[in-house]
Regions:
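Long, contiguous binding/interaction regions
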Residues: 1-9, 14-51, 59-161
Length: 161
């Protein structure tokens, strides 16, 4: 029996009210046996007329992804859903890195584009950087830094454009 090919997907889900929206979205994924890789919420701290959004990543077959599109769109708090493959050029990924040493320009050079790299702070324990770029450019840089033992800690998110 051949294994079904899984792809990396990104959903940006626009919601009316974030209270309970994330729970219902996570439940829909859990019911289908799909693990959410990354989840980021965007909204305002004070109640407003502006919609919030939830951006998440996951791996699944195209068929399961289509099932999730239909399930998520039917949720009462969902206004609309945007779906993209993880390697879409319209997506951007950002990361906050705690490193063991100061980064050099070659440490953060993408293969086909420049990445944003900003030194946020330095302390005795190391350095803190903000990095951003397309996932296809940023991921190899992050993996290289991790492999070389430069990364102490990392927090990242996906932002749909």
């Amino acid at each position: 029996m051949s294994e079904i090919e899984k792809y990396h997907w990104v959903f940006r889900i626009h919601v009316v009210d974030r209270a309970g929206a994330l729970t219902s979205i996570a439940s829909a994924f859990s019911n289908e046996g799909i693990n959410i890789g990354t989840v980021v919420g965007h909204g305002l701290e004070e109640p407003a007329l502006v919609e919030g959004s939830v951006v998440l990543t996951f791996f699944s077959s195209e068929e399961k992804k289509d099932i999730m599109v239909r399930k998520i769109q039917r949720l009462s708090k969902v206004i609309r859903l945007e779906e993209r493959p993880y390697d879409s050029h319209s997506l951007r990924k950002s990361a906050i890195l705690h490193t063991t040493r100061k980064l050099k320009p070659l440490d953060v050079a993408g293969e086909n584009s420049f990445l944003t790299c900003e030194l946020v702070g330095s302390e005795i324990e190391g350095f803190t950087y903000f990095l951003a770029g397309s996932p296809s450019e940023l991921d190899p840089v992050l993996h290289k830094l991790e492999k070389n033992g430069v990364v102490k800690d990392i927090v990242y998110s996906i932002l749909g454009l």
